[in-house]
């Protein structure tokens, strides 16, 4: 069974835990209890492949930022979450992305931009703004609602597909560099 190490990042209060718990346990957590760090595992079938998702739900609070480097090193793919009713959380995405690229020492890191809380009647981040940002990064963008479960699986499964493509790219690069000619 293939294992995927997913990390959920974003500012405090954007719904990282709510998204993760909705995926894992199929229910919405209404109360806000800031996370320090929680780990979840779930077996799912994505595109016919049985996968083990190892999901790290991280702290959005700035006082835990020192822990970020460690989980960014071990994560294979990142859900970069902002809340559509919180402009600052959207602006923070850039900092998370830059930190991930720095820690991974790579421009090519599997990521999905997630605009959460799309069930809310008012928004401060326009869908087009988020689509444009995702396009500039070359990553998918998905709007979710942890409350209604809208596109929650889609966000995590899309990240798994991004990791698969990344692994294939890495594999073909390794094959290119290790080819030898027998005389």
From Swiss-Prot:
InterPro entries for this protein: P-loop_NTPase (IPR027417), Small_GTP-bd (IPR005225), Small_GTPase (IPR001806), Small_GTPase_Ras-type (IPR020849)
Residues where GTP binds: 10-17, 57-61, 116-119
Any GO molecular function: GTP binding
Lineage top rank: taxon: Eukaryota
Keyword tags: Cell membrane, GTP-binding, Hydrolase, Lipoprotein, Membrane, Nucleotide-binding, Prenylation
Regulation (activators, inhibitors): Alternates between an inactive form bound to GDP and an active form bound to GTP. Activated by a guanine nucleotide-exchange factor (GEF) and inactivated by a GTPase-activating protein (GAP).
Biological processes annotated in GO: signal transduction
Localization: Cell membrane
Membrane topology listed for this record: Lipid-anchor
Assigned GO CC terms: cytoplasm; plasma membrane
Catalytic activity entry: GTP + H2O = GDP + phosphate + H(+)
Motif (Effector region): 32-40
EC number(s) recorded for this UniProt protein: 3.6.5.2
UniProt key word Lipid metabolism: no
Entry keyword Nucleotide-binding: yes
Broad class of enzyme this protein falls into: hydrolase
CDD domains xrefs: H_N_K_Ras_like (cd04138)
Function recorded in the entry: Ras proteins bind GDP/GTP and possess intrinsic GTPase activity.
Annotated family: Belongs to the small GTPase superfamily. Ras family.
Protein name per Swiss-Prot or TrEMBL: Ras-like protein
Organism from which the protein derives: Carassius auratus (Goldfish)
């Amino acid at each position: 069974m293939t294992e995927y190490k997913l990390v959920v990042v974003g500012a405090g209060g954007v719904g990282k835990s709510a998204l993760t718990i909705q995926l894992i346990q199929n229910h919405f957590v209404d109360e806000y209890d800031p996370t320090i760090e929680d780990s979840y595992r779930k077996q799912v079938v994505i595109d016919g492949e049985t996968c083990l998702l190892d999901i790290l739900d991280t702290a959005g609070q700035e006082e835990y930022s020192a822990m970020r480097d460690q989980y960014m090193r071990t994560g294979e793919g990142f859900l970069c979450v902002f809340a559509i009713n919180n402009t600052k959380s959207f602006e923070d995405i850039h900092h998370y992305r830059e930190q991930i690229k720095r820690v991974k020492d790579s421009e090519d890191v599997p990521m999905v931009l997630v605009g959460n809380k799309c069930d809310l009647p008012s928004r401060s981040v326009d869908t087009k703004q988020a689509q444009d940002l995702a396009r500039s990064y070359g990553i998918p963008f998905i709007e979710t609602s942890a409350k209604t479960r809208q596109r929650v699986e889609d966000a995590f499964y899309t990240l798994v597909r991004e990791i698969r493509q990344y692994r294939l790219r890495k594999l073909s690069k390794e094959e290119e560099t290790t080819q030898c000619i027998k005389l």
